[in-house]
Amino acid sequence: MSNTIKMVVGLGNPGKEYEQTRHNAGFWFLDELAWKWKASFKEEKKFFGEVARATLPDGDVWLLKPTTFMNRSGQAVAALAQFYKIKPEEILVVHDELDIPCGRIKFKLGGGNGGHNGLKDIQAKLGTADYYRLRLGIGHPGDRNLVVGYVLNKPSTEHRRQIDDAVAKSLQAIPDILAGKCEEATRFLHSK
C-alpha cells in the first residue's frame, strides 16, 4: 500500500528574524518530522524552498519548507507538486491558525483560507483548495489590527510550550494521515 500523502509542507517565513515567530509553527512541525524520519533538508532553488526526502516503508514523502515568504508559498508547493506529479489531495499543509486557541489542533481536507496568505497563494497556484491542512492553533490577539504584529512575534513561554505540545501530538497522528485513516486522525487530533 502506498502513502495517501506524498508531500508535507510546513509554512513559515525564511530568515533568522522569523525563526521563533508564531507564523513559523509549520516550520517547527516540519523540523520535528524531518528529525523523526531522519531526513535532511537542503536548499532547492528550482522548488523555491528547503526540501527533504523521507524514505518510508510505503514510499517516499517529500518535505517542503518554502523560502519564498508566506504570501508566495504556492510557488514552492506548485513547483514540487508538478515536478513529482503529486496531486493536491496528496498534499498536507501544516500552518499556524489564529482562529484556534493556542495549543489546539484541527485537521481537514479543503475549505477556505481563513485570511491566511500562505493558504491563499497555495490555492491560487494549485487551482483548488482540495488539499489537507493541519492547523496548529496559536490563538488570536483579540483585535484584528494587532494580527500582523502578533503572528510575526515570538509567543510567550507558556504559548510556545502549548504549540510544541500540539506539534508533538500532531506527529503521533502522521502514520494515520499517511495511511489515509483520516477519521481516526481527526478524532485523535480534535480530542483534548
Curated annotation (Swiss-Prot):
Keywords: Cytoplasm, Hydrolase, RNA-binding, tRNA-binding. PROSITE patterns: PEPT_TRNA_HYDROL_1, PEPT_TRNA_HYDROL_2. The record marks D96 as: Stabilizes the basic form of H active site to accept a proton. GO terms for biological process: protein quality control for misfolded or incompletely synthesized proteins; rescue of stalled ribosome. SUPFAM superfamilies: Peptidyl-tRNA hydrolase-like. One of its GO terms (cellular component) is cytoplasm. It comes from the Bacteria. The record marks N13 as: Discriminates between blocked and unblocked aminoacyl-tRNA. Its EC number is 3.1.1.29. It holds the Pfam family Pept_tRNA_hydro. TRNA binds at Y18, F69, N71, N117. It is an enzyme of class 3 (hydrolase). InterPro entries: Pept_tRNA_hydro, Pept_tRNA_hydro_CS, Pept_tRNA_hydro_sf. The active site is at H23. CDD domains: PTH (cd00462). It catalyses: an N-acyl-L-alpha-aminoacyl-tRNA + H2O = an N-acyl-L-amino acid + a tRNA + H(+). It is found in: Cytoplasm. One of its GO terms (molecular function) is peptidyl-tRNA hydrolase activity. Belongs to the PTH family. Monomer. PANTHER family: PEPTIDYL-TRNA HYDROLASE (PTHR17224:SF1). Hydrolyzes ribosome-free peptidyl-tRNAs (with 1 or more amino acids incorporated), which drop off the ribosome during protein synthesis, or as a result of ribosome stalling. Catalyzes the release of premature peptidyl moieties from peptidyl-tRNA molecules trapped in stalled 50S ribosomal subunits, and thus maintains levels of free tRNAs and 50S ribosomes. This is Peptidyl-tRNA hydrolase. It comes from Neisseria meningitidis serogroup A / serotype 4A (strain DSM 15465 / Z2491). The gene is pth.
